[in-house]
UniProtKB/Swiss-Prot annotation:
It is an enzyme of class 2 (transferase). N-glycosylated. This is N-acetylneuraminate (7)9-O-acetyltransferase. One of its GO terms (biological process) is carbohydrate metabolic process. Coiled coil: none annotated. It comes from Mus musculus. Ubiquitously expressed. It catalyses: CMP-N-acetyl-beta-neuraminate + acetyl-CoA = CMP-N-acetyl-9-O-acetyl-beta-neuraminate + CoA; a ganglioside GD3 (d18:1(4E)) + acetyl-CoA = a ganglioside Ac-O-7-GD3(d18:1(4E)) + CoA; CMP-N-acetyl-beta-neuraminate + acetyl-CoA = CMP-N-acetyl-7-O-acetyl-beta-neuraminate + CoA. The chain crosses the membrane at residues 19-39, 314-334, 364-384, 396-416, 440-460, 462-482, 487-507, 514-534, 547-567, 600-620, 639-659, 672-692, 699-719, 726-746, 771-791. It is found in: Golgi apparatus membrane.
Amino acid sequence: MAALAYNLGKREINHYFSVRSAKVLALVAVLLLAACHLASRRYRGNDSCEYLLSSGRFLGEKVWQPHSCMMHKYKISEAKTCLVDKHIAFIGDSRIRQLFYSFVKIINPQFKEEGNKHENIPFEDKAASVKVDFLWHPEVNGSMKQCIKVWTEDSVLKPHVIVAGAATWSIKIHNGSEEALAQYKMNITSIAPLLEKLAKTSDVYWVLQDPVYEDLLSENRKMITNEKIDAYNEAAVSILNSSTRTSKSNVKMFSVSKLIAQETIMESLDGLHLPESSRETSAMILMNVYCNKVVKPVDGSCCQPRPPLTLIQKLAACFFTLSIIGYFIFYVIHRNAHRKNKPCTDLESGEEKKNIINTPVSSLEILLQSFCKLGLIMAYFYMCDRANLFMKENKFYTHSSFFIPIIYILVLGVFYNENTKETKVLNREQTDEWKGWMQLVILIYHISGASTFLPVYMHIRVLVAAYLFQTGYGHFSYFWIKGDFGIHRVCQVLFRLNFLVVVLCIVMDRPYQFYYFVPLVTVWFMVIYVTLALWPQITQKKANGNFFWYLGLLLKLGLLLLCIWFLAYSQGAFEKIFSLWPLSKCFELEGSVYEWWFRWRLDRYVVFHGVLFAFIYLALQRRQILSEGKGEPLFSNKISNFLLFVSVVSFLTYSIWASSCKNKAECNELHPSVSVVQIVAFILIRNIPGYARSIYSSFFAWFGKISLELFICQYHIWLAADTRGILVLIPGNPTLNIIVSTFIFVCVAHEISQITTDLAQVVIPKDNPSLFRRLACTIAFFGGVLILSSIQDKSRL
């Protein structure tokens, strides 16, 4: 009864809401969100530096999130690279001195806070040619004015960056009097033109005063109240912002420290000075403001302009624009032709006569329609991760942000279960289900930033290995059973795997190796194909006639294993192979193939394990040792129970080991050899009981059919900044933002999967002469792209 109600309910839902309806809704949502963000940027401004300097919130303890953009955490080498031959000056009171110390410690963590506090403090890194000075001027007075005036008159002494601020001493010395505030306004007014003049050629920041924790203030500081601080800040802002009447002031207000202090001042030791973690955050913000445009970190979107379009991107834009125009012209012509062929009414009988000519969908129409849709989708990709239209945020990991969504999807997956069409081991529905739930877990892992939690990282590594295991299992099974080593099959698989990634490499200006998983499965597919296609070609049909063919296949697999082992422990040989042009253009990342070697080596044996498992399974199946009937256990009851017990123990043992990992490098070294234990254990647990083989989760299987597209699309339209951050379509509401962005992301992935399938039917013909002509055109196309890419790379140097 429950099953009947479920099926009726599902039909009712599908009647009113289909995948097509979902995609239309997603398109409307994208257009509305794009319009809202565009209007917001027109109204509030498009400068993310202003947001970085003025707004933000804490994601968690000590993790600051600027409004609308991502903040990069600078390493020592990056800071020195940015500040080479630069002079930075901090001028002000003890709070500015604290900021100076935190800034210098980014460059040199060993720098100590020592010496007389009420005097100038110099810092110089001669090797990096970086000079940072603190100048003790606790009040805005004639002394500070004279110092600033010298900089305006002497270009040699003038710093590249000036960070200034003072007020608490004026409040303290004059006991918070109104006369002191009036004098402060006069002094600020007198130095404002000088700061504005400096700001034309240098970066000038005025640091607004942070609030105090009045309960902790000593008796001689009790007059420094938050009310007084607000009055002094208001005076500084109004005067400095009005120092130029013709345009916006070039002196930047560093007001974000106030927000940071509001959350952390309770941790202060004296109620006046901020704790070290807060100072470090403010110093890192300063570093981002000045250095992001120089270093251009991927995970630092604040203060970075939109990257200029490359020649290849411009050509791609022209191609997609022409495709869209071409499709609309084709559509108008086709519609007019359809109107002419409308059913007409017979004058005698009054009945409609239907046109018996049914025009088939042409290859040209499929091509134009597919590229039209793909062009619009790529425009969305570009808007999300290149055009700075939508906002981005940093990831922040908590256990709840990872495990609660996992529980949600598991409940949904269990709820949507159906009977399988067949009950064989790793049948199609089951492998789709396996891919689906693994992909959903990996997506949650990426968006939650769970890679920082080692036990989760190690289990996710097994899921990635399981994908590669399926690659070995699936491709070996196909070639072994069907013996189809034709070029058509190879082209189909390569097109299915690589089409989206190649388009993204062109549109998003990213190297092929950036989407590391696709090169990985592509290379392993070719390795399996070459291993089995080379003479002698051994298939199941041939091996059944002579047992020695089995030995021949095992010899081939043994040689493959030997090659894998050699390349895994010979980094030099591996890098020489993949550093050859044009392979280097495909497998290099930032001028090195090390990343490719690391990725390949991390799961080097699991594809071989998949091939070996498929060989053993098919051999057992051929000899009818397995019982794969509906509801039947895979083996006899005793053997099945024993294998189930061993599998459960092995599965849990691996999880306990992975959860107890302390060192990522050591665990990664063991992972290639031991990941197969949990994979095979899972397969046996899932397939030995007959009832488990007979059902599958249609929810997970649906996602499994588009798992490749989900994995690739997440880089730019769900995550952001090339997976380093999170895309923000709806600011201020993280839960609603995730729901909306996920909905659009899944719809896009599904549509791209359909586009790839449609194009594969047209682009890859079954007759060899046509196929070879297409291959020649493809080679010429990639040759042109590689040449243009090489020219672009040289122009960037």
